[in-house]
């Protein structure tokens, strides 16, 4: 019997495209997009992901995958963190960069956490990836969130300036999905 597709809860077509590109054709399960209005939760990223995943599994009644992305400025002790979506919406890329005007430390961590549940009663598994970098004045395309202000360590370009293929080999999302792919390649993901 074939496994049911995994419902990736997102309304962001670019995110779905990136996830599929990173996982590749050899990934053993089909990933389908499902748009759900889940409650916007507050708290620590692991707790947010677990709760969001269980709520999604109750709605979908099957295997689900949810994602939460954080951008953590070291000078601001981890803020905006899981609230990056709201900061970006209100301030834009220039405003996010300007938040660090008073600090010498422009370093940051991009953090991506995927939560997977096989069903509504299943244990929620977390897969997290991190990329170190710096917050810079916006450069590059503005079609994917805060990519224009995040310059990964060891690079002279922002995520937005890098070719998609290169970004998908080094990003926080890649690192998290690599762990997910490893899980599904082993005994646990069957």
UniProtKB/Swiss-Prot annotation:
Domain of life where this protein originates: Eukaryota
Gene3D superfamilies assigned to the protein according to its UniProt record, in alphabetical order: 3.90.950.10
Residues that, per the record, bind Mg(2+): 40
EC numbers: 3.6.1.66
Gene Ontology process terms (BP): deoxyribonucleoside triphosphate catabolic process; nucleotide metabolic process
Keywords: Cytoplasm, Hydrolase, Magnesium, Manganese, Metal-binding, Nucleotide metabolism, Nucleotide-binding
GO MF assignments: dITP diphosphatase activity; ITP diphosphatase activity; metal ion binding; nucleotide binding; XTP diphosphatase activity
Pfam family, one: Ham1p_like
Record field: catalytic activity: ITP + H2O = IMP + diphosphate + H(+); dITP + H2O = dIMP + diphosphate + H(+); XTP + H2O = XMP + diphosphate + H(+)
InterPro entries cross-referenced by the UniProt entry: ITPase, ITPase-like_fam, RdgB/HAM1
Main location: cytoplasm
Compartments reported by the entry: Cytoplasm
Chain positions recorded as ITP binding sites: 10-15, 52, 68-69, 85, 144-147, 167, 172-173
Cofactor field: Mg(2+); Mn(2+)
A single GO cellular-component term on record: cytoplasm
Cofactor remark: Binds 1 divalent metal cation per subunit; can use either Mg(2+) or Mn(2+).
Function recorded in the entry: Pyrophosphatase that hydrolyzes non-canonical purine nucleotides such as inosine triphosphate (ITP), deoxyinosine triphosphate (dITP) or xanthosine 5'-triphosphate (XTP) to their respective monophosphate derivatives. The enzyme does not distinguish between the deoxy- and ribose forms. Probably excludes non-canonical purines from RNA and DNA precursor pools, thus preventing their incorporation into RNA and DNA and avoiding chromosomal lesions.
Subunit record text: Homodimer.
Family matches, as PANTHER family: INOSINE TRIPHOSPHATE PYROPHOSPHATASE, INOSINE TRIPHOSPHATE PYROPHOSPHATASE/HAM1 PROTEIN
Entry's family note: Belongs to the HAM1 NTPase family.
Protein name: Inosine triphosphate pyrophosphatase
Gene source species: Culex quinquefasciatus
């Amino acid at each position: 019997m074939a496994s049911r597709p995994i419902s990736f809860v997102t309304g962001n077509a670019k995110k779905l495209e990136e996830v599929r590109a990173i996982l590749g054709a050899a990934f053993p399960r089909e990933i389908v997009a499902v748009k759900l209005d889940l409650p916007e939760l507050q708290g620590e990223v692991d707790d947010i992901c677990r709760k969001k995943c269980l709520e999604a599994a109750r709605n979908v009644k099957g295997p689900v995958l949810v994602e939460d992305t954080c951008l953590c400025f070291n000078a601001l002790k981890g803020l905006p963190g899981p609230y990056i979506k709201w900061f970006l919406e209100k301030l834009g890329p220039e405003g996010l960069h300007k938040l660090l005007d008073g600090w010498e430390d422009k370093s940051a961590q991009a953090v991506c956490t995927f939560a997977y549940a096989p069903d509504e009663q299943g244990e929620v598994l977390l897969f997290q990836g991190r990329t170190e970098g710096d917050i810079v004045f916006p450069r590059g395309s503005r079609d994917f969130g805060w990519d224009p202000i995040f310059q990964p360590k060891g690079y002279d370009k922002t995520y937005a300036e890098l070719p998609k293929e290169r970004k998908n080999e080094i990003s926080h999302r890649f690192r998290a999905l690599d762990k997910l792919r490893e899980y599904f390649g082993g005994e646990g993901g069957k």
